[in-house]
Amino acid sequence: YKIFNIESARSLPNLPEGHPCKNIHGHSFKIKITVMGAVNEETGFVMDFSEIDSAFSPIFKMIDHAYLNELDGLTNPSSENLCKWIWAKLIDSLPNLKRIEIKETESTGCIYEGKIHG
């Protein structure tokens, strides 16, 4: 797996009035991208970490220091929806993708294991 640190702002518009997360607020997200597969006998890797970096780089540029609600497909950017959104953007370039985990604080987060590609 590889962990990326993202600074982003969001609001969760579908929450009831008075809920603090309905307001614009920020998080220092930790996004953990996990791949799974057989170990390549020659390299000793399941996947080179640089491949994960390359696949995630365009997404990182979109979401780091961004207001997530303004991104296409993220009008309600809960951590769960952000996981699904990232999965959809990564699965074609990372067919061994197994799991996306997002921590929004040290004690809260979510894990998404979407459909396996193919």
Feature locations, PLM:
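Charge-rich, low-complexity N-terminal segments
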Residues: 1-118
